[in-house]
Design a protein with these regions (language model features):
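Glycine- and small/polar-enriched repetitive beta-structure motifs of secreted/surface proteins
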Residues: 1-320, 326-333
Length: 336
């Protein structure tokens, strides 16, 4: 009966190894459990399950071929997964690496190179094949995601968050400075406090904000709102986008404002409001579609050959106020 029970049990549990005593599973910690060839559980309450699995700290859990959990209360789950920080979690298998041309990365012997899932700092979490969380409190979720800043979060395949408390969400998104946020595929926030939202959006100045498909805010405190909008000057604001084949708004001088598709403000402290409006000179204002302000300290509501009237103008009362036609007619009548 004992032989029959033993035979039945082995039908549902098998572990292959050398079977010569050289790769026995070893559990040396109190209440530790080791299962699999060369599995090792050393800490109190440690659990190592899988060939070559190592659980080397109190309450550590390693599950999978060559999985390693060396931090207290750490969890490594997956082939080659590594959880080395206290309270760290690494869940995922290995991921084959490819170069920028899509060719497999090979070692010196011509063998493919694989990246393991790794959580190497206290309270770090790595989820996904080849994901890496390498600083305290960092979270990397997605195949190849990498969170290397303290308390940073990288969510998405190959997303990267390298600044302290940086956040990157989306395929190959990147947040590379402290407090930076990038949300959207290929989005990038590369300076302190920068925020990029949208596919391919880029925020590269301190406190810059880019919102929209391909929007770019590339200088200090600049703001670009709309698809492909560009704000490239300090404190600049570009509002209004354009899709492929059309002209986006662009605020390129310091402290300018460009609003509407194709609005352009290269002048310092200039404002362009309207489709294709241009404020070229410093402190100039262009109002209306195709308006051009090309002299300093002026306001333009049209352009040469495309002039506009200004209507509903109240009578001027101060020396620098505009004078309307009624006032001029009154002067003409009085002089007769």
């Amino acid at each position: 009966a004992l032989a029959e029970a033993s035979e039945n049990a082995t039908r549902y549990f098998k572990a292959n190894g050398a079977n010569d005593g050289t790769d026995d599973a070893t559990a040396t910690g109190d209440y530790a459990t080791a299962s699999g060839s060369a599995a090792l559980a050393e800490g109190v309450g440690a659990t190592a399950t899988g060939s070559g699995a190592f659980a080397l700290a109190n309450s550590a859990t390693a599950t999978g071929f060559s999985a390693t959990a060396t931090g207290e209360n750490s969890v490594a789950n997956g082939a080659g997964a590594q959880a080395t920080g206290a309270g760290s979690i690494a869940v995922g298998g290995q991921r084959q690496l490819f170069d920028e041309n899509g060719d497999p990365v090979l070692d010196e012997d011509g063998n493919p190179v694989y990246a393991s899932t790794e959580a190497t700092a206290d309270d770090a979490t790595a989820l996904g094949a080849g994901a890496v969380a390498s600083e305290v409190g960092a979270t990397a979720a997605g195949a190849g995601a990498n969170a290397s800043g303290a308390y940073a979060s990288a969510l998405g395949t190959e997303a990267t968050a390298s600044g302290t408390q940086a956040t990157a969400v989306g395929f190959r998104s990147g947040a590379s400075d402290d407090a930076a946020t990038a949300v959207g595929g290929y989005s990038s926030a590369s300076d302190f406090g920068a925020s990029a939202f949208g596919y391919g959006a880029e925020a590269s100045g301190n406190s810059a904000t880019a919102l929209g498909f391909g929007a770019v805010a590339s200088n200090f405190d600049s703001t670009a709102l709309g698809s492909n909008a560009v704000a490239s000057g300090d404190n600049s604001v570009a509002v209004g986008g354009a899709f492929f084949g059309f002209i986006p708004s662009e605020a390129s001088g310091d402290c300018p404002v460009a609003a509407a598709g194709g609005a352009y403000t290269p002048g310092f402290n200039s404002v362009a409001l309207g489709n294709l409006a241009t404020a070229e000179a410093d402190n100039s204002v262009a109002i209306g579609g195709d308006s051009v302000a090309d002299r300093e300290d002026t306001v333009s509501v049209g352009s040469a050959g495309s002039e506009r009237q200004i209507t509903n103008v109240a009578a001027g009362t101060e020396g620098t106020d505009a004078v309307n036609l009624d006032q001029l007619n009154a002067v003409a009548e009085a002089s007769e």
